[in-house]
Amino acid sequence: MKLGFIGAGNMAQAMIGGILAKGIVKKDEIIASAATQKTIDKVSEEFGVNVTLDNTEVAKADIVFLAVKPVYYQEVIDEIKSVVNENQIIISVAAGKSVEWVENAFGGEKKIVRIMPNTPALVGEAVTAICPNKNVSDEEKKVVSELLSSFGIAQFINENIMDAVIAVSGSSPAYVFMFIEAMADAAVAEGMPRAQAYQFAAQSVLGSETGKHPGELKDMVCSPAGTTIEAVKVLEEKGFRSSVIEAMSACADKSRNM
């Protein structure tokens, strides 16, 4: 099985790293392209995979990941669609580009899978939504799921909730990073060294995954008349929850209108 990545930025590199780490394919079975020599040199050096500046070479792979920014999708598809056939699987990694949009851009009866991973793929902890079109067989769905599970967890969804997925997982790492940064800033203001503040804040988030309901976990930390409930009280007064909800709503709206 040959895998191709058109676009070799952070997300593509995270996916390549995860797939290789699980031994799903060998290095020489992956080829990646990018717009600059600097990027493909970096990918070649770090992962030992085949690289090229020619997108049409990558488009000959059995499974082709379109990992360029949405604004370049039409241009790249126009470049490669004469090379792509009905037996290949095209995996679209872009916000705002529906399965139908990608189908129409390629034309014909292509096998299209729309996915939305997130940047925790860089540490093998991504959550990836998967939405295949009707041309993808059950066996091919299993193959795609195995690939995407190599750098985190992967779940099939209905495309009508993809905008919600983008808001709750695709973009949400940025919200968490901002939260960690704000906590670290507050710790620095209280006298903690910057590097240590980031470590404490980040580890507190990392250690919060238990499988329990978040409300239950919050209550476990909030002792009566304690310091934590005092902090929670201020967060509620300042509209912490509503800010998060409104931000995610804006994110989903942006995805719908791209």
Show which residues each predicted segment covers.
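NAD(P)+-binding Rossmann beta1-loop-alpha1 motif at the extreme N-terminus of oxidoreductases
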Residues: M1-E46, N50-L53, E125-A126, V188-E190
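Internal alpha-helical scaffold of NAD(P)-dependent oxidoreductase catalytic cores
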Residues: W101-K111, V127-A164, F177-K212, K254
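Hydrophobic residues within alpha-helices
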Residues: M15-I16, I80, M183
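Small-residue helix-packing motif on alpha-helices
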Residues: I30, I40, V58, P193-F200, ...
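A short glycine-threonine-serine/GTX helix/turn-capping micro-motif
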Residues: V165-A174, A195, K218
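NAD(P)-dependent Rossmann-like dehydrogenase/reductase catalytic/cofactor-binding core
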Residues: A202-M258
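Rossmann-like NAD(P)(H) cofactor-binding subdomain of soluble oxidoreductases
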Residues: Q37, E45-F47, N55-A59, I63-I130, ...
